[in-house]
Amino acid sequence: AFAEAAVDQVEPIFRSGLGAQPARFKGQGDFATEVDLVIEQQLRDILTQMTGIPVYGEESGGSVLDTVWVVDPIDGTANYSAGNPLAGILVALIHKGAPVVAVSDFPLLGRRLVTCDGSPLRSVGGPATGFGGGEDAMGFDEARGHVGCSSHLPTEIFHELRETGLRPRMTGSVGLDNAFVAQGVFDGAINFSPHPWDNAAGALQIQTAGGVVTDPEGNPWTAQSRGLVAGTPQVHATIVDILSRHSGSFHR
């Protein structure tokens, strides 16, 4: 409830700032807008005041303590700055290295996913989940094989994914890729981000929906993992198998 209330308060800032220009460059084409900075500070203030738990944010730092909030004020900043609506707000509570509360909000798409450990996934906008359900459920289609991935994916891995029949898709937002897996829009996702604010929310949401979530080597995902592979059992296994043959090309 605290995480969702905090997101509710910053969502109007997110909506009104679409197209904001870079304000801080972080290297290798990465940057933050003034909206990133404002939203993160507000999330930090709100969550700390409400819960007393420290916040680890993309723009202002922190550390992965025993219990900590991790926030990405704008996941997909390059999209957002260009006026592309494929961007969102990610908030997760990590306890002993694992996410236990998660909110992924995509205001410009009208989609939000919310869950906490032990509770079902709540999905607003789009299908609730592709896992389980009856024959008529909006679901994962392993024959379709859509896999969210980033432009940092090595070329040889990209091509091998295609050769197995999977279909890589690049949204420009790690958080959206993960949310799409939880909703059943994508059948899998892969990224090599070492940052917990990118993957913590999605990891919990996909697991809650019944998907498989690991690091790129196939180990359980934790806040210290350097990347994430997720999806249906079949798609996840296919991706991990491909990565096992190319491990030297994605360790950064």
Q: Which residue ranges define each predicted feature?
A:
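An extended, acidic
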Residues: 135-252
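Residue-level signal for inorganic ion chemistry
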Residues: 10, 14-17, 36, 47, ...
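Conserved residues at the C-terminal ends of beta-strands
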Residues: 58, 105, 192
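Short helix-loop capping/hinge motifs at secondary-structure junctions, enriched
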Residues: 120-123, 128, 234-238
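N-terminal subdomain of lithium-sensitive/metallo-dependent phosphomonoesterases centered on the IMPase/IPPase/PAP
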Residues: 1-74, 252
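Short amphipathic alpha-helical face segments that pack within enzyme cores
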Residues: 42, 88, 201-204
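DPxDG-like acidic metal-binding loop motif
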Residues: 65-122
